[in-house]
Amino acid sequence: MSNKFGVITNDIQPIGTNNKNVENIKNRQDGLDFIKTLKDSIQDVNTEQQTSEKALADIASGQVKDLHQAAIAINRAENSMKVMLEVRNKAINAYKEILRTQI
């Protein structure tokens, strides 16, 4: 069927029925899952903190073999904790922003 503009309207599909691409995107899992990445990051921070605590205990007991490596371990743990806290703060701010959004 043609209208006055010469466009065949029978071939035009409604927007809702042509969602094959959307389904393909939903079913694809190419990247890492966000929750898994977050858990791995928290585990890494925990490992850094444990290494730092061991280095501090070795310094306190006089068993430290390399003071420079102990200082590096402590600094790494401090930096990883700062990054994790910053990620937490950003997540909390994003959550608060979503709560303020009016529908």
From Swiss-Prot:
Q: Which domain of life is it from?
A: Bacteria
Q: Which InterPro entries match?
A: FliE
Question: Where does the protein end up?
Answer: Bacterial flagellum basal body
* Coiled coil residues, start to end: none
Q: Which UniProt keywords apply?
A: Bacterial flagellum
Cellular component aspect of the GO annotation: bacterial-type flagellum basal body
Q: Name one GO molecular function term.
A: cytoskeletal motor activity
A Gene Ontology biological process noted in the UniProt record is: bacterial-type flagellum-dependent cell motility
Q: Which PANTHER family match?
A: FLAGELLAR HOOK-BASAL BODY COMPLEX PROTEIN FLIE, PTHR34653
Annotated family: Belongs to the FliE family.
Q: What is this protein called?
A: Flagellar hook-basal body complex protein FliE
> What gene is it encoded by?
fliE
